[in-house]
Structures are given as structure tokens and as C-alpha cells.
Amino acid sequence: MTLIDQLPRTPDPDALYEAFESWAGERGLTLYPHQEEALIEVVSGANVIVSTPTGSGKSMIAAGAHFAALARDEVTFYTAPIKALVSEKFFELCKIFGTENVGMLTGDASVNADAPVICCTAEVLASIALRDGKDADVGQVVMDEFHFYAEGDRGWAWQIPILELPQAQFVLMSATLGDVSFFEKDLTRRTGRPTAVVRSATRPVPLSYEYRYTPLTETLTDLLEARQAPVYIVHFTQAQAVERAQALMSINMCSRSEKEQIAELIGNFRFTTKFGRNLSRYVRHGIGVHHAGMLPKYRRLVEKLAQAGLLKVICGTDTLGVGVNVPIRTVLFTALTKYDGTRVRTLRAREFHQIAGRAGRAGFDTEGFVVAQAPEHVVENEKALAKAGDDPKKRRKVVRKKAPEGFVAWSEQTFEKLIGSEPEPLASRFRVTHTMLLSVIARPGNAFEAMRRMLEDNHEPRKQQLRHIRRAIAIYRSLLDGGIVEKLDTPDAEGRIVRLTVDLQQDFALNQPLSTFALAAFELLDPESPSYALDMVSVVESTLDDPRQILAAQQNKARGEAVAAMKADGVEYEERMERLQDITYPKPLEELLFHAYDTYRKSHPWVGDHPLSPKSVIRDMYERAMSFTELVSHYELARTEGIVLRYLASAFKALDHTVPDDLKSEDLEDLIAWLGEMVRQVDSSLLDEWEQLANPEVMTAEEAQEKADEVKPVTANARAFRVLVRNAMFRRVELAALDQVEQLGEMDAESGWDADAWGEALDKYFDEYEDLGTGPDARGPKLLLIEEEPENALWRVRQIFHDPNGDHDWGISAEVDLTASDTEGRAIVRVTDVGQL
């Protein structure tokens, strides 16, 4: 029986409340006083702002709100900041209300979009609000994690529904809202409904606070002895979190029995990367690492071990928050300051409470603990003073250690102030874009009046409003000049006095806003060109968000190589530094793409909201015949391999879906198959999550996670595996061309081809030929011979060298072990010979 079956015949507030309370009681749940207060207001039709601590049951309030909306025959929307949380809530609400009554919209996927309960990202609802305004079929909006309203890049999406959906009842929820008096008055004025603020300073699990002057290892030992684990140690960089985990390996945290349980739960889990092998050591010792730069499968393993109560300590970053499912008893701050991208500053009250609020597990703990460490130099000074005892002379002789230069200090008073401070008021992040104007112009009615109202009656200060008005006028003029909109002499049948001259439906994609530009740019490429497949990749890569860490690493690598070359050429220091300013990461087709983008933007001005960014990550990887591990190693990206994988997965999805089938050459299909299989073998969870979001009726979130943990044999995808083998062989050709015998030796020492053996073979080749080709012809299929021996689980391969004379009588012979390849998730190539045929 679902909650739908409990709906009373009429939406009487008392009947609604009693029905919901009865349903909760049947599940052994007793409503907290603040939940009762919120639900009474919701069923009466009021807007409700719920500002209660983490773990206080806001999900129950949301379910009650949806229940009330359904009773009134209204469509109710639940919004969350990230797709994973939207998906999680979708399945949760399916269990409560039945799958036929719940839908999901994420930009990537649309499932049961006509359902009366819709789970979506904030941007999706904002898009609906802009497109349909007061005529939108939205009766109620439940906004979870409403503090995202103040996020610099995304906050506008939390404001637009409030401005444009006066017909809706709003339920705004967060643990860190601060002063909400502005929203209380604003919602009432706009919707005509009373607005109730439900606060509760009382946590289901109360918190205790402590400031420590002891070294961190001593603090941690005390916490473990006091049975206050699991402890989440908060760091403000990913590097610090990993370094801490390594440093804590000297502390014995788990008994032999606990270590056996950890090993049993890990089972056959595959730690495929350098960081993964380190993580394996940490977790077997009872120490987890958790940050956004990790592969999803590693984060999921840490969460799984933590949920089983097997990790004593988790070293993580301050990003712990939305969508992170890690049970914690104690939060230990290593600092109360952070670098925000511009400067080092003290934590804001909202940031502090967002992290501290994770301490204490409802249903498990009777108390949570929040501990902050004094700065290291203060700890050392306290230790020296304690050693001096009460002797005044000894205390005067203590040489106090100074803070590092430029250090931003914090103290016990800082800690106490943060504890007692309310989160800062939420700041408006309204913005004007081409998409906003086009959406408003497309809706029925007077677009000028609608835009004037939105621009003059938003949450911005007047000075900012004037700036937005000027921006809107400039955008409108560009649309008019470009022929995208036209003014009408008389209003049309739906009251428009300005209308669009183009159909926006095919041009608007929340997840890939530049995909239509890519389709136009494909037409500029020559299908007969040897570089056609890679040029298609470059077009798609230019439309993707920049992976900043990868691009910075590419630039650093390029500059390092340039400096070495200039030094070898005797270039003076000043000139070297001057030349370096012009060296950046690779940007294939830059001139062609920017020229095409400028032309395309004249007739599609809304793409101006999304700048083009040529780059070469996939192309660079493919041209160098690199595996994922080699890419991470080459650019020293071990700490951000999760970000690398996320970019590769996004590129695969874009290539797979953006490029029309009739434009996919055989080489491009090979490349796409290789990329998809590589992503799956490293960590399939990103692609599985994508497939699950697109087809939730086929696969639940839990099944998607189970699927992600089950690695398919790499040889099962024959096309992709053939490309993996080709790349593995050609990687050796590239290194041979550069005479990198040390790297070749590292790759092939186990099969008897160390650096000396490679050096001897290549000396013979270069005695005969001046050069070894690595261009498109060199990596063509004609120069790779594969003889399959399935009965022996073996392939015999021969990579022929592309010599300058075209003799093609030298090459590399190797065996590919299919069984070992499936075990490792990559092509296991064993060189057997390098020489003449």
C-alpha cells in the first residue's frame, strides 16, 4: 500500500494531516514537533520555510507536502542541486507514492514527465518557470538545500521559480538558512499565501564542541579511545587529505578481526590506479579517504565501508555535504580557515555549520562531537609551555614558534564565534541571459511587461537591477538585429507584441547547450582527411566544460618541455620567460572553430551564454596512444583522477549522442568504442548512472551501483578491445620514435625487454633508418597484423614500423594474453621480439 491509498476524499487540512500522521505511525515513525508544525502549515496551504538541523527529518516534511498537493490535484515539484540526489529522491518517492505517480527531469533524462510528482534539478524548474510563468502547471514547489540560492554560478535557478510562479505553494528547506525574514515577506507578497517559518535549534542528536591544543595524532587517539569514531577529519585541499591518511598509517586503529571484516567486504574489488593501490592500504588499516577528485567507485567503497562501521577515520575535504552518504560521529577540523580561490579567509558560519552538522548519526548516536585543532605553531608553543611547568623562569625562556609568513590565524574565540553564529543571510545571484529573454518572448502575452516585472522586481539591489536592465536591452537588440525576434504591429492571438522567428525546441539542451553548434561545425570538416575522426573529436571537445586541472597540467607539461628545449638551444633566461607566456595547452582547430562560432552566433545569439573552448584531452590521449593510467601518470593527475574520468565520460556521451550516425567514419566509431570501453573498465559507475537516469524503469539506482561493481570482461567488446591493443602497440612505436628506452623498459621488463634490450634493438633500426614515423599512416590498420588464437586465449600481433623508405620490414612482435587482459581490465601485451621481419 502506498501513501496515495491514504488520500482522503476531500483535501480538508485536518483530514490530510491525520491521514499522513497515521501513515507515518504505521511505519513506526513519530513526528518531531517541528515536523508537525511544518505539516500543519503545509496542509493549510501556507508557504513554509524549514530551517532545521541536519538529520531532523526534512524528507518527511517534503513527503507530507507532496501528499497535500496530490490531495488538491496539483502537480508538485521536488528540486535538488545535483542529479544524483534527484535520482535518489525519485526512487524514494516511487516507493512512497507508486511509480506511476512520480516522474523525473534532469536535463539528461525525462521519465514519466506527466506524473503529478516531479523530481528535477533546480535548473529544470527554472527553465519551466521562464518558459510558462504563471501559466505553468506547477501547484507546489519543494526546494531542498535552498542555501544553494547563494551559489555564485547557480543561485539564479533557485530565485527564478519564486519570481515567476506566483500560483505555487513553496516549501524551502535547508539546515543553514540564517535570517529568512526577507523570504518570508517576499513569498507572501508574491503568492498571496501566508508564509510560516519553522525553526528548530534542537537537534535529534545533540552536538558537543571541543577546541584542542594537542597534536592531531594525540587528539585522534583520544577520540578513538573515547569511542567517538568514526571521525571525519576535515582538510581544505585534496592533497592534505591524502597526506593525512598516509601519516595516520602508523596508528593501529583496527583489531585483527575488524581488518578481516574489511578484507571480506572489499572482496574482489579492483584497485586499478596508482591512487587506488594506496587507498587499498589505507582502508585495510581502517582509514578512508573521501574527496571530489577520486574515482566514483573509490568514493562508493569508502562510503560502503563506513556504513558498515568498519572505518575509524575518514580523511576528507570540506566538500562533504549534499549527496554524500557517510555516517559520522565526530567531525574534526584541522583548520578554521580556507583558500576560496582568491585568498585565505576564516570559514563562514554557513560553511562551518554545514560541515559540523554532519556529526552524530540519528538512530545510532545519542551525541555527536565537533572538534577543532589549534594551529600547529600554537600547539607546539603550548607543548613547550607545558614542559616548562609552573616555573616562571623556565616559562620566560621558552622560545615561542612564530606563525608561518602570511598565515591567517584562528583561535578558540574563532571557534566559539562560529558555533554561536547564525548562517549569513542568503545573497541574490540573479542573472540575465539570452536563454531567459528567448524563453519569456516565446510564452504568450506581453514579453516586455513580463521582462520589466522580472528585472525590476527581483531580489537584487537597485544598482544591480539597473545593470541587468542594460544587459537585457543589449541582448534584445542583438536578437532583433539578428532577425531572431520581430516586433508585431498588433498583438497576436495570444497577446504577443514581439515573437520569435525560429523554433527553439531543437536548439535548447540543458545538458549540451553547444551541441547544435557542433552539428553545424561538423559540416566544415573533410571526411576524406586522414585526421577527420580526430577533428570531429576536437569539435565536440570544444563544446564541453573545461577540466581545469587537466588543462593546467597540459600547460605545465608543455612549458616544462619548452624550457628544456630552449635551455638546450642556449636561449637566455629573460627571453625564455617571455616566450613561455605564449605557450598554453593544445587547442586543435582553434582558428577554424572560433571563426565558425562567431558566424553561428549571429543567427543563434543565445550560444553566447556558453563560450566555446577548444582543447585536446581525448585527442591528445588517442594521438599518444595512452591508457587512462598513462594519461594520469604523464600529467601527474593522480589526485584528480575522478575529474579526469568524469571528463572522459562526458566526452564519450557527447560523441556518442551528438555525432549523427551518417557522419561517423569507421575510425571515429573505433575511437568512440575505445573511449567508452576505457571509461567502463576504469570505473563504469558514471556511464551506468547515466543509463540508469535515462531508463530508471529498467534499472534502479541500487542495481546501477551493483552493475558498476561488476566489471565486464574487457575482451567482450571486440571492437573496443582491438583498439586498445592497437593503442598499446602504437604507444611503444611513439616511445621508440623518441628513443625513450627507459619508459619502454618499464613497460616490458617482465617479458624480457628491459631498457638495454630495447636500446640494442632500436640502435640497429636507427643505423638503417634516420626516422621512425608516428603520423596517421604509421598507426593505420595496414601496419598492425593480428592473428587470433581463441583456443589458447591469445592474440599474436605484429606492429610494423613506418620507415622513411616505405620498406616496412621492421616492427614489434607481441602476444596479447586475453585472460590476463580480462583480469586487469586492459590489454596485456607481452613483447616477444623487436627487429626485422
Put a short name on every predicted segment:
Residues 288, 307-308, 391-798:
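Non-catalytic terminal extensions of ATP-dependent helicases
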Residues 21-24, 29-205, 212, 230-235, ...:
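Conserved P-loop/Walker A NTP-binding site and adjacent catalytic elements of P-loop NTPases
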Residues 330-333, 337-339, 345-386:
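Conserved segment of the helicase C-terminal RecA-like domain
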Residues 802-837:
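Compact beta-sheet-dominated globular domain cores
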Residues 79, 87, 94-103, 238-313, ...:
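Conserved C-terminal RecA-like helicase domain
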Residues 114-130, 285-296, 305-325:
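Conserved two-lobed SF2 helicase motor
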Residues 1-48, 255-284:
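Helicase-associated low-complexity/disordered flanking segments
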Residues 212-236, 243-246, 300-308:
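Conserved interdomain hinge at the start of the Helicase C-terminal
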